[in-house]
Amino acid sequence: MAETNLYIVRHGKTMFNTLARVQGWCDTPLTQSGRDGIHYVGLGLQDTKFEEAYSSDSGRAIETMRILLSEHPDGKDIPYHVDPRIREWCFGSLEGGFDAEMWGVLPRVLNFKTEDELFATEVTFEEIANA
């Protein structure tokens, strides 16, 4: 069986990342710093042979992938697929709120005493989205 390598790159820094806001399905654009960082990642992957590329359907993921592919010598020939099934978590009513508020609310609404207890326990995506 042939060896397969999977490379996972997180999207570049966004406006909400800068503002410490919860961002799952809500979408904010990459900052200049985020775009610059992804260009550097792309430069670092120039010698890597890719068969295909995938991203979620969020604008920040699509922009990230376009930047990565623009830095690759074969980028125009690498098949690129946008797939909503790999979209980030939806944080429900917490979307767009402050990160600190989310981390204060999640343990309580999921019936944990502390944030540490929450992280020590498996919580499903559905439980978080419905919190």
Where are the regions that the model predicts?
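Active-site-proximal alpha-helix that buttresses catalytic centers in soluble enzyme cores
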Residues: 4, 9-75
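Phosphate-handling substructures
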Residues: 72-131
